[in-house]
Regions:
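ASCE RecA-like P-loop NTPase motor cores
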Residues: 1-278
Length: 278
């Protein structure tokens, strides 16, 4: 049963158990940010950021925002000792299917490393090759060195390999490109909230044709998607990639406590009205 909180400060007195799976729903994004500032002392707390886009906007969210969201979705899905904070509009907006935000690869020093397999996987998950890595969702390959800025990390990772084995894993500074601390393992997450592979593209194509009576070549979103490329604003068609409506409900599995800020229901109704207006 949900517990109602009056303000972002009330949560401090509720005694949240960090060893359980908790969801805190706020009335708006500003309240979510304020609440995060008030519970910084708790362990394993994540903010599911709002895309900052209006419903049906033909824009995509910023790479940093997208990376944080994917990391939060994945962490909340796989952990039973976590607290997630999100505004009601964020939870009512389209989100990825849980199957899409599970780690792609778990790499460790000394393990076998098939570079072509890894490259194929990250390309299908939306990573883009660049000469130098500076933003989440990018990778660079130079000889036996793979640089990648994962959506789940604060810093890009440098993977050095030799003879199909991982020799070193390090974070590095994207501005200076100088390696920093060593790490023992790394989990890959997708770059976008939708899959980019043959199955998902075929699903998208069929869903598009079933839903719209338009000439496909007139749509930049459709043509880019068919070429396995990211199209600005394609996220408004998120359900077409999965062949079904995607909501936050599957992520509620194993949640033990839900806290809801006062006036959240009113804000939910206002958001639904905004969707209908647009």
């Amino acid at each position: 049963m949900a517990k109602v909180i009056n303000s972002s400060t009330d949560i401090i007195n509720l005694g949240i158990d960090s060893s359980k799976k908790n969801l805190i729903i706020t009335k708006d994004s500003q309240s979510a940010m304020q609440l995060m500032n008030n519970i910084q002392n708790l362990s394993n707390v994540f903010l599911l950021e709002n895309s900052e886009l209006l419903p049906y906007d033909f824009f995509s969210m910023a790479p940093i925002t997208r990376a944080k969201r994917i990391s939060s979705f994945s962490s909340f899905l796989k952990s039973n000792e976590i607290t997630l904070v999100a505004s009601i509009s964020t939870l009512l907006s389209p989100c990825p299917d849980p199957s899409h935000v599970t780690p792609l690869n778990n790499l460790r020093i000394g393990e076998n490393f098939n570079i072509q397999e890894v490259i194929d996987n990250i390309i299908l998950s939306g990573y883009v090759r660049e000469d130098f890595v500076s933003l989440p969702g990018q990778y660079a390959l130079r000889g036996s060195v793979l640089d990648i800025f994962l959506t789940s990390g604060k810093s890009p990772i440098r993977i050095e390999f030799f003879d199909n084995k991982i020799e070193t894993l390090r974070t590095f500074n994207p501005e200076s490109q100088i390696a920093n601390e060593k790490i023992s393992s790394v989990n890959f997450l997708p770059s976008y909230e939708y899959p980019i592979n043959k199955i998902s593209i075929d699903t998208f194509k069929q869903g598009w044709r079933d839903s719209f009576d338009v000439f496909e070549e007139d749509s930049e979103i459709f043509t880019k998607t068919m070429k396995l490329r990211h199209a600005e604003g394609v996220e408004i068609y998120l359900p077409l990639f999965f062949g079904k409506r995607t909501t936050f409900l599957p992520f509620l599995r194993d949640v033990e406590k839900v806290f809801v800020q006062l006036d959240t229901e009113t804000k939910a109704q206002e958001f639904e009205e905004l969707i209908q207006e647009r």
